[in-house]
Amino acid sequence: GAATRPRVRRKSARHIMLRATEKELNMILAIDIGNTTVALGGIRDGRVCFVARMDTVRTRTAAEYRAEMDKIFAHRRHPERPMRFEGAVLTSVVPQITGALAECARHYTGKTPVIVSPDIRTGLTMGVDEPRAVGKDRLVDAAYAAANFPLPIVTVDLGTATTFNVVDKDRVFRGGVICPGLSTGLRALGERCAQLPQVHLGSPKKAIGTNTESCMLSGSVLGTAVLIDGMVQRIEEELGSPATLVVTGGLAKYVTPLCRHPLTYDPELLMKGLALLYQLNAPQEHGRRHGGGRHYGQQGRLRAKHPH
């Protein structure tokens, strides 16, 4: 009788709480501010649920970025399960707009974002001359790769610049290599050389080109693959052992099939790295004390979650 009633009530309350939780898409908002684009990722339980991009505009205000982000999130809303950002993590190689996007992150989560810097926990020891000068995206790639692949490891990110990062067997970030990016080099050729056309990216069939376009494609795409193979070989010689190679970046899909060194291609390396750094650095119970986070309802409108 009476003795069983509290037990039934507790069970049903817990059941209701679990069902309410299932109705929300709780995510971490990951923001990667690059030279060309700002990537926004929604990460849930270490899995990347979505990635969207907007142009990097150095003169844009926080309000202008927020208007753009509202559109992106409204487009990705789920009709039954509103998205809720319970925290945010941000990395930037464009200091002029870091503050504006950190403000956006606060708006969507109600909390200060984790901002990537050499001061936060990464699982790495910095073994370079100026740790603060290391590109934050390079740090994110290296931290995730070192935590998830055999050491030593080399990560290569093919973006506006092509960057190599090296972590040795003792988890020391040793530095790396920075080169002009594949598309940057192609664009420069088209702009600086009057007789050279703009070339559409693809994977060249062979090294020897038989027309201007195939020569340029070979030089840029196959040339990048040869650069990766040759540079990793030199790095391995300096480390004194073979290294794991992980390649990422929007242009990697054209290059990785042409590389001869064994590699893993992970287009989501940086987003996964941001999720890892959030886990390592966010305060315990981040966001639960004040009922945190904000929801996107069926109309995609932002609505604050009531703390009670």
Indicate residue ranges for each PLM-predicted region.
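Short beta-strand-loop/turn "lid" adjacent to the catalytic site in phosphate-handling enzymes
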Residues: 78-134, 170-176, 181-182, 210-221, ...
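Short, low-complexity intrinsically disordered segments enriched in A/P/G/S/L with frequent Arg
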Residues: 4-9, 13, 17-20, 293-294, ...
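Short glycine-rich, Thr/Ser-proximal phosphate-binding strand/loop in the N-terminal lobe
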Residues: 28-71, 81, 172-197, 202-203
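ATP-binding/phosphotransfer module of carbohydrate and carboxylate kinases, centering on a glycine-rich
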Residues: 25-30, 188-308
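Phosphate-binding/catalytic loop of phosphoryl-transfer enzymes
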Residues: 111-192, 221-234, 267, 296, ...
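A short acidic, often aromatic-flanked loop/helix-cap motif at beta-alpha or helix-coil junctions
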Residues: 59-61, 120-124, 269-273
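Phosphate/pyrophosphate-binding loops at sites that engage ATP/ADP/AMP, CoA/4′-phosphopantetheine
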Residues: 69-87, 231-243
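Short glycine-aspartate micro-motif
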Residues: 28-32, 89, 153-157, 246
